[in-house]
Every structure is written in structure tokens, then in C-alpha cells.
Amino acid sequence: MRRSLVATTVLALAFAAPAAAGLPKAGALVPGRSLGGIRLGESPQAVRAALGTFYGTCRGCPRRTWYFTYRPFDKHGLAVEFTDGQVSGLYTLWQPAGWHAPHKLGFGSSPLAVHTLTGASRTVTCNDYEALVRDSAHARTAYYLFDGRLWGFGLFQRGASPCR
């Protein structure tokens, strides 16, 4: 009986750990530190442990890039870029519901709110959108604007272009 209970517990824990991995329902941007719970410099193994193995791979991207979404072919989620085997960039895909930054800054906020609440003071113009950026010691945090509203978040190595 005791062996059976131990074996059942071990099996339950083994199957529970992978089930816990996945894209967060309400991911958070921690400026200069993390996006969706993933930090710059993490290994692919650490990303898989946190987000699971349900991701697509970008075939035309200059860096190895994984797209984590909530359902197959869904546009909403998180992109994770790798350089030399480490996370070098993270950005939201479209506007995943519930994702936010500090001060309750969410998608749809005005550029003025982004400037005021984040201190992002530099504007980088990309092809069809803009990014308000703020550099910290080791990272660049990006607040993407489209059509005059906050559209997404990004986190990159310091000085990296936020344009994708």
C-alpha cells in the first residue's frame, strides 16, 4: 500500500510540473527586468520550463524567435528571441488580454500616460508604429504605440532596436 501511494504521488508530481508551464493569463512587464515572467539572459531550457513547449518558430527572423500563443494560430501572446543561446529580446504579440505594466498601465493608454507613468522619453520610429523606450543599466524597455495608443510591450538588451 505504501509503495503504491509513493508511486502515485511521484507520478502525480511528474505530470503536474509540465501542466503548470504555459503562457500567463495576465502577463506583466517589469521594466528593465522581465516580460511575462521571462528575463533577458535565460536559456531556451528555462523558457520551456516556464512557458511550455507549445510555440511556433519564426522562419524569416534574423534571430531564433519563438512565438508563444494561447491557441494554435492565435495572434496574441509573447515572442522570445535568442542570441548565442540566451534570451535577447521579448515582446508581446498583438494585445494579449490582461497583460499590463506597473501603475496599471495597459493597452489602449495614451502616449502621455506612457511618458508620465514610465519615464520613457525617447521615441524610436519603426515602419508602421513607434516605440517609446527607456534604458536601464542592462536593458531597454519598449512601449509600442500604434494609431496613437499603447499597443504592446518589449524588453531588449540595452541599446537594441525595438523595431521588429
Which residues fall in each region the model found?
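Sec/Tat signal peptide C-region and signal peptidase I cleavage site
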Residues: 17-21
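Bacterial N-terminal signal peptides
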Residues: 7-16
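A short, ordered amphipathic alpha-helix with a cationic face
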Residues: 22-24, 88-91
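Bacterial N-terminal signal peptides that target proteins for export
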Residues: 1-6
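N-terminal periplasmic "start-of-domain" segments of outer-membrane beta-barrel proteins
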Residues: 26-29
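A cross-family detector of function-defining hotspots
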Residues: 42-86, 95, 105-164
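Second-shell loop/turn segments in exported
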Residues: 31-38, 98-105
